């Protein structure tokens, strides 16, 4: 993506629509205003009603033009937005007219926001916040994205970076003014104190049980239990549709089937899994393996007991897990365990209560961390690596392995934290982040 190009794209929803917004950014904006707008380029931040023509003089539409001059724009470049009628023919003509001008091309996904990042208008976490707010479906997702877009994460990571930079300066003093090769205790003490403080804060951030990522991507709930206990029917009841195949044949479900719901104001992925049992069937055995993995990775497990089959109680039930006693409408062969929820997928008994229990769990989990520092897997990966480097730096100082080694470890940690917000070269990360944006953003 060459910065000298001028880019354009439809920034509003797909046609037909009442209004279409064509966004343009780059050095050719002034030429576009002069060539295509009947009234010329408007004054900065002033909307102008004008006729828009193509380079052959054919009328495209009558619309509103809004100009923002560099660096006072979203991208930091000269930008022009055209508000046109939202018919497909108008939009197609406008984009063809723009790209007919030398140096103007259609934008790639996320290219406007990438230019904003490259021009210092946003850092990488703020750019991710832009993508997240576009995709937000729940109030919790929107609030988290707005906080990130507003620099909430930047402030925290910049604080750590500033503290580490000061720590590195103290280590450099130790290197430049050694005391006969030993680390002076009065110099090492404040360095160790700084390192311990930052490490403690990072450990706290990493101990959030993935709340920020779950708010963004969705909480995971796995329905587990023996074959024919009614797991698929429970999924269908919760989904209010036939999401999973239901038969009387044990072992019908052989893969993980997921549905996406919004419960308790949070996105929740509920997975129906294969019945847990020993089997010689290769395909079913793979399904059981996947079921166990889904259960292990889930935030919450729904353990299903078949009330007509006195099978052993579920294994590995954690405190927050839910036990449901299915087929409560039939004559139970066993008594429901204490704390189990009696349900019937036939009559619907207990389904609403099960749904409310799931909603209560995800609501509690989402509110357990007031302001998550980690909202994506890449943030967690960098923090884990940064913490490892800081631990190595502390150990080097404590064991007298040398200030040089400690300094190098602190530099590594600083680089890891800086890469989260894009303060260092992260070209591979940029491609992954901005490729997920929509065209026009």
From Swiss-Prot:
InterPro entries, per the entry: G_TrmE, GTP-bd, GTP-bd_TrmE_N, GTPase_MnmE, MnmE_dom2, MnmE_helical, P-loop_NTPase, Small_GTP-bd
Per UniProt, K(+) binds at 228, 247, 249, 252
Checking Gene3D superfamilies in the record gives: P-loop containing nucleotide triphosphate hydrolases, Probable tRNA modification gtpase trme, domain 1, tRNA modification GTPase MnmE domain 2
**A GO CC term?**
cytoplasm
Alphabetized, the UniProt keywords read: Cytoplasm, GTP-binding, Hydrolase, Magnesium, Metal-binding, Nucleotide-binding, Potassium, tRNA processing
**Which cellular compartments is it found in?**
Cytoplasm
Q: Is GTP-binding among this UniProt entry's keywords?
A: yes
Residues in TrmE-type G domain copies: 218-363
Cofactor: binding details: Binds 1 potassium ion per subunit.
What positions does the entry give for GTP binding?
A: 228-233, 247-253, 272-275, 326-329
Pfam families given for it? MMR_HSR1, MnmE_helical, TrmE_N
Instruction: Return the similarity comment.
Output: Belongs to the TRAFAC class TrmE-Era-EngA-EngB-Septin-like GTPase superfamily. TrmE GTPase family.
Assembly behavior:
Homodimer. Heterotetramer of two MnmE and two MnmG subunits.
Please report the name of this protein according to its UniProt entry: tRNA modification GTPase MnmE
> Which classification does the entry list for the species?
Bacteria, Pseudomonadati, Pseudomonadota, Alphaproteobacteria, Hyphomonadales
């Amino acid at each position: 993506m060459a910065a000298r190009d001028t880019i354009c794209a439809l920034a509003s929803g797909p046609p037909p629509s009442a209004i279409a917004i064509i966004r343009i950014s780059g050095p050719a904006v002034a030429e576009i205003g002069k060539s295509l707008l009947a009234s010329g380029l408007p004054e900065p931040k002033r909307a102008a009603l004008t006729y828009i023509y193509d380079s052959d003089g054919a009328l495209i539409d009558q619309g509103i033009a809004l100009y923002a001059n560099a660096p006072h724009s979203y991208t930091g470049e000269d930008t022009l937005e055209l508000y046109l009628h939202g018919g497909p023919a108008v939009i197609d003509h406008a984009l063809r007219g723009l790209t007919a001008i030398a140096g103007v091309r259609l934008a790639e996904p996320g290219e406007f926001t990438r230019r904003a990042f490259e021009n210092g208008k946003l850092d990488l976490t703020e750019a991710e916040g832009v993508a997240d707010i576009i995709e937000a479906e729940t109030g919790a997702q929107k609030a988290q994205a707005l906080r990130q877009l507003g620099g909430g994460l930047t402030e925290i990571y910049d604080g750590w970076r500033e503290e580490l930079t000061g720590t590195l300066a103290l280590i450099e003093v130790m290197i430049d003014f050694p005391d006969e090769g030993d680390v002076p205790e009065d110099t090492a003490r404040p360095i160790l104190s700084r390192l311990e403080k930052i490490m403690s804060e990072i450990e706290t951030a990493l101990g959030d049980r993935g709340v920020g990522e779950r708010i963004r991507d969705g909480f995971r709930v796995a329905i587990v239990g023996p074959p024919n206990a009614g797991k698929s029917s429970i999924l269908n009841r919760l989904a209010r549709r036939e999401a999973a195949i239901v038969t009387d044949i044990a072992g019908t479900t052989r893969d993980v089937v997921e549905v996406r719901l919004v419960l308790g104001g949070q996105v929740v992925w509920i997975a129906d899994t294969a019945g847990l049992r020993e089997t010689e069937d290769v395909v079913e055995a793979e399904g059981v393996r996947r079921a166990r993995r889904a259960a292990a990775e889930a935030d919450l497990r729904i353990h299903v007991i078949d009330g007509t089959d006195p099978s052993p109680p579920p294994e590995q039930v954690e405190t927050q897990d839910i036990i449901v006693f299915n087929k409560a409408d039939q004559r139970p062969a066993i008594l429901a365990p204490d704390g189990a929820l009696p349900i019937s997928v036939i009559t619907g008994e207990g389904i609403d209560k099960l749904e409310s229990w799931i909603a209560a769990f995800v609501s509690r989990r989402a509110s357990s961390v007031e302001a998550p520092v980690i909202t994506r897997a890449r943030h967690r990966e960098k923090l884990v690596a940064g913490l490892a480097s800081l631990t190595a730096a502390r150990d080097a100082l404590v064991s007298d392995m040398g200030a040089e080694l400690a300094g190098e470890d602190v530099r590594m940690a600083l680089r890891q934290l800086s890469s989260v917000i894009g303060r260092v070269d992260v070209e591979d990360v940029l491609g992954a982040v901005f490729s997920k944006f929509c065209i026009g953003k």
